[in-house]
Amino acid sequence: MPSDRLRSIVPMFGGATRYVETLDSILQFVATHEPSTAELVGWHRGSFANVSSRDSIMRRVQYLNQAEFVNQEGSYWRLGPVGKEYSEAGDMETLLRIMCERNVGLRSLLYALSAGPMTIAEVSDQQLDTHPELGWTRGETDMAKQRANWLRSMGFVEKNGNEYVLTADGWVFVEDAVSTWADSDWSPPVNESDEMHAGTYETTVHARSVDPEFRATVLSRHDQSCPISGVDHPGLLDVAHVLSWSDYPAHRADLSNVLALSKTHHAAFDRGLFTIDVDYRLRVNPAFETESDVLQRTIIDREGERISIPEESLKPQYVTQHNSSLAWL
Protein backbone atom coordinates (compact mmCIF):
# COMPACT_ATOMS: atom_id res chain seq x y z
CA MET A 1 0.00 0.00 0.00
CA PRO A 2 1.39 3.45 -0.85
CA SER A 3 2.62 5.14 2.33
CA ASP A 4 2.20 8.62 0.83
CA ARG A 5 -1.45 8.63 -0.12
CA LEU A 6 -3.07 11.22 -2.35
CA ARG A 7 -4.70 14.20 -0.67
CA SER A 8 -6.55 15.48 -3.72
CA ILE A 9 -9.30 13.49 -5.40
CA VAL A 10 -10.58 14.72 -8.74
CA PRO A 11 -14.09 14.32 -10.15
CA MET A 12 -14.72 12.34 -13.31
CA PHE A 13 -16.67 13.75 -16.24
CA GLY A 14 -20.24 12.61 -16.69
CA GLY A 15 -21.97 13.66 -13.48
CA ALA A 16 -21.95 13.11 -9.74
CA THR A 17 -23.08 9.49 -9.77
CA ARG A 18 -21.22 8.39 -12.92
CA TYR A 19 -17.59 8.60 -11.83
CA VAL A 20 -17.19 4.82 -11.92
CA GLU A 21 -18.89 4.53 -15.32
CA THR A 22 -16.48 7.14 -16.68
CA LEU A 23 -13.49 5.44 -15.08
CA ASP A 24 -14.52 2.13 -16.66
CA SER A 25 -14.78 3.76 -20.08
CA ILE A 26 -11.36 5.38 -19.78
CA LEU A 27 -9.70 2.13 -18.72
CA GLN A 28 -11.39 0.21 -21.52
CA PHE A 29 -10.24 2.78 -24.09
CA VAL A 30 -6.68 2.76 -22.77
CA ALA A 31 -6.53 -1.05 -22.63
CA THR A 32 -7.85 -1.39 -26.17
CA HIS A 33 -6.00 1.40 -27.96
CA GLU A 34 -2.93 2.32 -25.84
CA PRO A 35 -3.43 5.91 -27.02
CA SER A 36 -1.08 8.82 -27.27
CA THR A 37 -1.82 11.85 -25.12
CA ALA A 38 -3.42 13.62 -28.09
CA GLU A 39 -5.62 10.60 -28.77
CA LEU A 40 -6.64 10.35 -25.12
CA VAL A 41 -7.55 14.03 -25.03
CA GLY A 42 -9.47 13.66 -28.28
CA TRP A 43 -11.37 10.68 -26.93
CA HIS A 44 -12.48 12.71 -23.90
CA ARG A 45 -13.65 15.56 -26.13
CA GLY A 46 -15.66 13.17 -28.26
CA SER A 47 -17.13 11.22 -25.35
CA PHE A 48 -18.40 13.97 -23.04
CA ALA A 49 -20.55 16.97 -23.83
CA ASN A 50 -19.09 20.39 -23.06
CA VAL A 51 -15.61 18.96 -22.41
CA SER A 52 -12.88 20.66 -24.42
CA SER A 53 -10.18 22.02 -22.10
CA ARG A 54 -6.98 20.04 -22.45
CA ASP A 55 -5.87 21.16 -18.98
CA SER A 56 -9.12 19.94 -17.42
CA ILE A 57 -8.84 16.59 -19.17
CA MET A 58 -5.18 16.13 -18.27
CA ARG A 59 -5.83 16.99 -14.62
CA ARG A 60 -8.04 13.92 -14.46
CA VAL A 61 -5.62 11.80 -16.44
CA GLN A 62 -2.75 12.79 -14.16
CA TYR A 63 -4.81 11.84 -11.11
CA LEU A 64 -5.42 8.40 -12.62
CA ASN A 65 -1.69 8.23 -13.34
CA GLN A 66 -0.80 9.11 -9.73
CA ALA A 67 -3.24 6.48 -8.49
CA GLU A 68 -1.69 3.98 -10.94
CA PHE A 69 -4.85 3.27 -12.88
CA VAL A 70 -2.93 4.31 -16.00
CA ASN A 71 0.76 4.76 -16.77
CA GLN A 72 2.49 6.74 -19.50
CA GLU A 73 5.14 4.70 -21.26
CA GLY A 74 7.02 6.82 -23.74
CA SER A 75 4.43 8.56 -25.90
CA TYR A 76 1.58 6.19 -25.07
CA TRP A 77 -0.79 5.42 -22.22
CA ARG A 78 -1.31 1.91 -20.89
CA LEU A 79 -3.09 0.39 -17.92
CA GLY A 80 -1.15 0.68 -14.67
CA PRO A 81 -1.03 -2.09 -12.05
CA VAL A 82 -4.12 -0.79 -10.29
CA GLY A 83 -6.01 -0.38 -13.56
CA LYS A 84 -5.22 -3.98 -14.47
CA GLU A 85 -6.26 -5.25 -11.04
CA TYR A 86 -9.57 -3.41 -11.06
CA SER A 87 -10.32 -4.27 -14.70
CA GLU A 88 -9.78 -7.96 -13.99
CA ALA A 89 -11.86 -7.96 -10.80
CA GLY A 90 -14.56 -5.58 -12.00
CA ASP A 91 -16.29 -5.22 -8.63
CA MET A 92 -16.91 -2.28 -6.32
CA GLU A 93 -15.26 -3.90 -3.31
CA THR A 94 -11.97 -4.00 -5.21
CA LEU A 95 -12.37 -0.43 -6.43
CA LEU A 96 -13.18 0.88 -2.95
CA ARG A 97 -10.17 -0.91 -1.50
CA ILE A 98 -7.96 0.63 -4.19
CA MET A 99 -9.39 4.11 -3.65
CA CYS A 100 -8.95 3.82 0.11
CA GLU A 101 -5.38 2.59 -0.31
CA ARG A 102 -4.46 5.54 -2.50
CA ASN A 103 -6.50 8.42 -1.08
CA VAL A 104 -6.61 9.98 2.37
CA GLY A 105 -9.95 10.20 4.14
CA LEU A 106 -12.43 7.96 2.35
CA ARG A 107 -12.60 5.40 5.14
CA SER A 108 -12.91 8.02 7.86
CA LEU A 109 -15.83 9.57 5.95
CA LEU A 110 -17.59 6.21 5.82
CA TYR A 111 -17.01 5.77 9.56
CA ALA A 112 -18.36 9.25 10.26
CA LEU A 113 -21.47 8.59 8.18
CA SER A 114 -22.16 5.50 10.28
CA ALA A 115 -22.95 7.90 13.14
CA GLY A 116 -25.69 9.60 11.11
CA PRO A 117 -26.49 11.63 7.97
CA MET A 118 -24.21 14.54 7.10
CA THR A 119 -24.59 17.63 4.94
CA ILE A 120 -21.79 18.44 2.53
CA ALA A 121 -20.62 21.22 4.89
CA GLU A 122 -20.42 18.66 7.69
CA VAL A 123 -18.53 16.28 5.41
CA SER A 124 -16.02 19.04 4.66
CA ASP A 125 -15.53 19.82 8.35
CA GLN A 126 -15.20 16.12 9.22
CA GLN A 127 -12.50 15.60 6.62
CA LEU A 128 -10.50 18.64 7.76
CA ASP A 129 -10.92 17.86 11.47
CA THR A 130 -9.81 14.25 10.98
CA HIS A 131 -7.20 14.89 8.28
CA PRO A 132 -5.87 18.46 8.63
CA GLU A 133 -3.15 17.60 6.12
CA LEU A 134 -5.80 17.82 3.38
CA GLY A 135 -5.32 21.55 3.66
CA TRP A 136 -8.28 23.00 1.80
CA THR A 137 -9.92 26.19 3.08
CA ARG A 138 -12.51 25.58 5.78
CA GLY A 139 -15.96 26.37 4.45
CA GLU A 140 -15.16 25.26 0.91
CA THR A 141 -17.08 22.15 -0.10
CA ASP A 142 -15.85 21.25 -3.60
CA MET A 143 -13.25 18.75 -2.38
CA ALA A 144 -15.68 17.21 0.07
CA LYS A 145 -18.28 16.87 -2.67
CA GLN A 146 -15.84 15.03 -4.93
CA ARG A 147 -15.13 12.51 -2.17
CA ALA A 148 -18.81 12.00 -1.45
CA ASN A 149 -19.55 11.59 -5.15
CA TRP A 150 -16.88 8.92 -5.58
CA LEU A 151 -18.51 6.97 -2.76
CA ARG A 152 -21.95 7.57 -4.29
CA SER A 153 -20.74 6.32 -7.67
CA MET A 154 -19.43 3.15 -6.05
CA GLY A 155 -22.74 2.58 -4.29
CA PHE A 156 -21.54 2.97 -0.70
CA VAL A 157 -23.20 6.35 -0.06
CA GLU A 158 -26.41 7.92 -1.30
CA LYS A 159 -27.80 11.44 -1.15
CA ASN A 160 -31.17 12.07 0.48
CA GLY A 161 -32.13 15.70 0.02
CA ASN A 162 -29.20 17.72 1.33
CA GLU A 163 -27.73 14.88 3.37
CA TYR A 164 -25.42 11.98 2.63
CA VAL A 165 -26.07 8.57 4.19
CA LEU A 166 -24.57 5.10 4.05
CA THR A 167 -26.15 2.49 1.80
CA ALA A 168 -26.46 -1.16 2.83
CA ASP A 169 -23.13 -1.85 1.12
CA GLY A 170 -21.60 1.08 2.99
CA TRP A 171 -22.70 -0.41 6.30
CA VAL A 172 -21.18 -3.77 5.39
CA PHE A 173 -17.86 -2.10 4.61
CA VAL A 174 -17.80 -0.11 7.86
CA GLU A 175 -18.57 -3.14 10.01
CA ASP A 176 -15.59 -5.04 8.61
CA ALA A 177 -13.10 -2.25 7.94
CA VAL A 178 -12.13 -1.38 11.51
CA SER A 179 -10.27 -4.69 11.82
CA THR A 180 -9.46 -5.54 8.19
CA TRP A 181 -7.69 -2.19 7.70
CA ALA A 182 -5.80 -2.41 10.99
CA ASP A 183 -2.52 -3.05 9.18
CA SER A 184 -2.80 0.10 7.09
CA ASP A 185 0.54 1.89 7.12
CA TRP A 186 -1.03 5.36 7.14
CA SER A 187 -0.83 7.36 10.33
CA PRO A 188 -1.90 10.93 11.07
CA PRO A 189 0.81 13.55 10.60
CA VAL A 190 2.62 14.47 13.81
CA ASN A 191 3.96 17.91 14.62
CA GLU A 192 7.70 17.81 13.99
CA SER A 193 8.31 19.59 17.30
CA ASP A 194 6.89 16.62 19.19
CA GLU A 195 9.61 14.33 20.46
CA MET A 196 7.22 11.39 20.69
CA HIS A 197 5.00 9.87 18.09
CA ALA A 198 3.31 6.56 17.62
CA GLY A 199 3.95 4.61 14.46
CA THR A 200 1.37 1.98 15.28
CA TYR A 201 -1.82 2.23 17.23
CA GLU A 202 -2.66 -0.65 19.52
CA THR A 203 -4.91 -0.85 22.53
CA THR A 204 -3.12 -1.27 25.82
CA VAL A 205 -5.01 -4.19 27.29
CA HIS A 206 -5.25 -6.57 24.37
CA ALA A 207 -2.47 -5.26 22.05
CA ARG A 208 -5.16 -5.00 19.41
CA SER A 209 -4.75 -2.85 16.32
CA VAL A 210 -7.56 -0.89 14.70
CA ASP A 211 -7.81 0.93 11.39
CA PRO A 212 -5.80 4.17 11.75
CA GLU A 213 -8.58 6.11 9.98
CA PHE A 214 -11.14 4.77 12.47
CA ARG A 215 -8.84 5.83 15.26
CA ALA A 216 -8.37 9.28 13.72
CA THR A 217 -12.15 9.62 13.38
CA VAL A 218 -12.69 8.76 17.05
CA LEU A 219 -9.99 11.15 18.28
CA SER A 220 -11.41 13.94 16.13
CA ARG A 221 -14.91 13.41 17.55
CA HIS A 222 -13.50 13.55 21.08
CA ASP A 223 -11.36 16.67 20.64
CA GLN A 224 -8.09 14.71 20.52
CA SER A 225 -8.00 14.26 24.30
CA CYS A 226 -8.84 11.87 27.12
CA PRO A 227 -11.80 13.25 29.12
CA ILE A 228 -10.58 11.56 32.31
CA SER A 229 -6.90 12.48 32.37
CA GLY A 230 -6.68 15.40 29.97
CA VAL A 231 -3.91 13.66 28.00
CA ASP A 232 -3.94 15.19 24.53
CA HIS A 233 -0.95 13.65 22.75
CA PRO A 234 -2.24 11.39 19.95
CA GLY A 235 0.48 8.81 20.54
CA LEU A 236 -0.73 8.34 24.12
CA LEU A 237 -4.41 7.89 23.31
CA ASP A 238 -6.39 4.72 22.65
CA VAL A 239 -9.78 3.91 21.17
CA ALA A 240 -11.71 2.40 24.09
CA HIS A 241 -14.81 0.30 23.45
CA VAL A 242 -17.69 0.44 25.93
CA LEU A 243 -19.02 -2.94 24.82
CA SER A 244 -15.85 -4.94 24.42
CA TRP A 245 -14.21 -5.64 21.08
CA SER A 246 -14.01 -9.38 21.68
CA ASP A 247 -17.53 -9.94 23.03
CA TYR A 248 -19.43 -7.58 20.72
CA PRO A 249 -17.86 -7.73 17.24
CA ALA A 250 -20.97 -6.16 15.68
CA HIS A 251 -20.22 -2.92 17.58
CA ARG A 252 -16.50 -2.65 16.84
CA ALA A 253 -16.97 0.15 14.30
CA ASP A 254 -19.90 1.80 16.09
CA LEU A 255 -18.84 5.36 16.93
CA SER A 256 -21.46 5.48 19.68
CA ASN A 257 -19.63 2.60 21.40
CA VAL A 258 -16.18 4.21 21.63
CA LEU A 259 -14.38 7.05 23.31
CA ALA A 260 -10.81 8.29 23.50
CA LEU A 261 -8.87 7.38 26.64
CA SER A 262 -5.22 7.58 27.59
CA LYS A 263 -3.50 4.22 27.50
CA THR A 264 -3.39 4.01 31.30
CA HIS A 265 -7.03 5.01 31.72
CA HIS A 266 -8.09 2.65 28.95
CA ALA A 267 -6.47 -0.21 30.85
CA ALA A 268 -8.20 0.89 34.06
CA PHE A 269 -11.55 1.12 32.28
CA ASP A 270 -11.24 -2.32 30.69
CA ARG A 271 -10.32 -3.80 34.08
CA GLY A 272 -13.42 -2.34 35.69
CA LEU A 273 -11.58 0.05 38.00
CA PHE A 274 -13.90 2.84 36.94
CA THR A 275 -16.75 3.46 34.54
CA ILE A 276 -19.13 6.23 33.52
CA ASP A 277 -22.90 6.25 33.85
CA VAL A 278 -25.53 7.35 31.34
CA ASP A 279 -25.18 10.94 32.60
CA TYR A 280 -21.42 10.76 31.90
CA ARG A 281 -20.55 10.86 35.59
CA LEU A 282 -17.44 9.07 36.78
CA ARG A 283 -18.10 5.99 38.91
CA VAL A 284 -15.19 4.37 40.74
CA ASN A 285 -14.79 0.80 41.96
CA PRO A 286 -14.77 1.02 45.80
CA ALA A 287 -12.00 -1.57 45.91
CA PHE A 288 -9.71 0.51 43.71
CA GLU A 289 -6.67 1.63 45.69
CA THR A 290 -3.56 3.23 44.29
CA GLU A 291 -0.40 5.01 45.33
CA SER A 292 -0.28 6.82 42.01
CA ASP A 293 -0.90 10.54 42.34
CA VAL A 294 -2.12 10.63 38.75
CA LEU A 295 -4.71 7.89 39.22
CA GLN A 296 -5.78 9.31 42.58
CA ARG A 297 -6.25 12.78 41.12
CA THR A 298 -7.85 11.83 37.80
CA ILE A 299 -10.06 8.92 38.90
CA ILE A 300 -10.62 8.42 42.64
CA ASP A 301 -10.86 12.10 43.58
CA ARG A 302 -13.29 12.72 40.71
CA GLU A 303 -15.92 10.19 41.81
CA GLY A 304 -19.35 11.50 40.78
CA GLU A 305 -18.02 14.27 38.51
CA ARG A 306 -19.42 14.65 35.01
CA ILE A 307 -16.70 14.11 32.45
CA SER A 308 -16.43 16.29 29.38
CA ILE A 309 -17.43 14.34 26.30
CA PRO A 310 -19.79 15.43 23.51
CA GLU A 311 -23.50 15.08 24.24
CA GLU A 312 -25.05 11.89 22.88
CA SER A 313 -21.67 10.56 21.80
CA LEU A 314 -22.35 7.22 23.51
CA LYS A 315 -25.53 5.17 23.30
CA PRO A 316 -27.07 4.96 26.79
CA GLN A 317 -27.99 1.31 26.25
CA TYR A 318 -24.35 0.44 25.60
CA VAL A 319 -23.27 2.18 28.80
CA THR A 320 -26.04 0.47 30.77
CA GLN A 321 -25.15 -2.93 29.34
CA HIS A 322 -21.47 -2.45 30.12
CA ASN A 323 -22.17 -1.32 33.66
CA SER A 324 -24.52 -4.23 34.33
CA SER A 325 -21.50 -6.52 34.07
CA LEU A 326 -19.70 -4.73 36.93
CA ALA A 327 -20.44 -6.52 40.20
CA TRP A 328 -19.46 -3.50 42.29
CA LEU A 329 -21.88 -1.07 40.63
What are these regions (language model features)?
Residues 73-74, 160-161, 228, 235, ...:
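A generic structural-conservation signal
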Residues 71-72, 102-111, 150-156, 168-175, ...:
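Short, surface-exposed, charge-dense and proline/glycine-enriched linear segments
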Residues 5, 39, 84-88, 98-102, ...:
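Amphipathic, alpha-helical segments enriched in basic
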Residues 199, 203-214, 220-221, 231-237, ...:
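A detector for short metal-coordination/catalytic motifs
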